């Protein structure tokens, strides 16, 4: 856990505060990267964590039933996003091409702040990105979204069973997943270990994010929820996990 020291997150805040980067002009911290107070000008937008969760799960139900609405894809809507963004939720998901976040939740342009990394692991860059979305874009819900058959979790399970190491940067991902496998019974089949490992890894990332001091304050104030979930490849359904 000591890898999650705040140095990189502090650097991100300095970057935002100083306006360093391509084309960034700031008047205050809430305007970083074209942000505004969340959901301004959108009276129907959900405000609470539970409202946002209901919105996402209703969208996923439409995806499962093949009744997609494809919201917020018009040229007029796109034009409203040229100066600011008001995402309603943050999704930390895997890079897997089979899990297209906006499609899975039937959301459109500007609706979701999406962070994708193989194995949905939490390193400095990911934790900083999540903090940015919560502290500056004011998203009231963070969902950690794993998926069935995750290749990164599969690699971690296979390494635990067979030994060996992968190339340096891939190994870094595996090393971050391996602690989550401690709760997974080695006597299970490989398939069942992967299935259990996916859930354990999602819960691990949820725990790490929930322990970040600034996010913990928001959770304590009941303005933020961090929710673990798994996407089922066969059905397309997002299944919420118990914390």
Where are these regions (language model features)?
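Internal active-site segments that recognize and position negatively charged phosphoryl groups
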Residues: 211-215, 222
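Divalent metal-coordination and catalytic microenvironments
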Residues: 56, 91, 144, 228, ...
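Short HxH-centered metal-ligating active-site micro-motif
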Residues: 49, 99-194, 198, 204, ...
